[in-house]
Curated annotation (Swiss-Prot):
Cellular-component GO terms for this entry: chloroplast thylakoid membrane; photosystem I; photosystem II
Residues holding chlorophyll b 1: Y58
A molecular-function term among this protein's GO annotations: chlorophyll binding
Chain residues that bind chlorophyll b 4: Q165, R176
Annotated chlorophyll a 1 binding sites: W80, S86, E99, R219
Role summary: The light-harvesting complex (LHC) functions as a light receptor, it captures and delivers excitation energy to photosystems with which it is closely associated.
Protein name: Chlorophyll a-b binding protein, chloroplastic
Species, as recorded: Triticum aestivum (Wheat)
Gene name in the database record: WHAB1.6
Subcellular location, principal: plastid
Amino acid sequence: MAATTMSLSSSSFAGKAVKNLPSSALIGDARVNMRKTAAKAKQVSSSSPWYGSDRVLYLGPLSGEPPSYLTGEFPGDYGWDTAGLSADPETFAKNRELEVIHCRWAMLGALGCVFPELLARNGVKFGEAGWFKAGSQIFSDGGLDYLGNPSLVHAQSLLAIWACQVVLMGAVEGYRIAGGPLGEIVDPLYPGGSFDPLGLAERPQAFAELKVKEIKNGRLAMFSMFGFFVQAIVTGKGPLEDLADHIADPVNNNAWLIATNFVPGK
């Protein structure tokens, strides 16, 4: 590294002398440039109808001309931004990252809300299968048992759970943002580089389609989670229990009647 730096500082490259810079500056600039180049390289053009100027828009042929800054480069871009939230590139990059991360959490959360109820309806014993009541089991005398089995995971300390969450999630987020032990950031949002166990980035066209599927399902999951929150507040039941009640008696168990008869605090 020292020999390389000395040769660069004392010779010319492409007819222009290279300025004498400290090795730390060269290394720092190289790291930044490598990350920027890698990030740009991940934006793969696709012949898919979900990318480019001819992509599917939010109202189809009635959508009109999308804003100039929405070029169809990223997954989930339907050319709709009436509030101008994506006009500033830095704000757009930040919001895009937040949306993708929230989409993933919402998909996991929606599965976590429905799956325990589904298992409970098929004979698996839980202390509490309702997603919004399950956490309160930690305050019971017996504590919180995973899948109702104390030999799997048994928790009685809220502080211990909080500490584990902070440590584990902090490690995962740190790995995602910093690029892991190798310090390689190809794209902090998607697999690639040092972390791509399924080899998704090796198939650019298929990977581009998967990104669209992820963002579409993630947006639906965020709406689903909002619906689960409202259901829990209004009916005090989980999503599958509410669905079963509606199927059994759709006339008296529907969103309109429940909403109009809802009294906060009762």
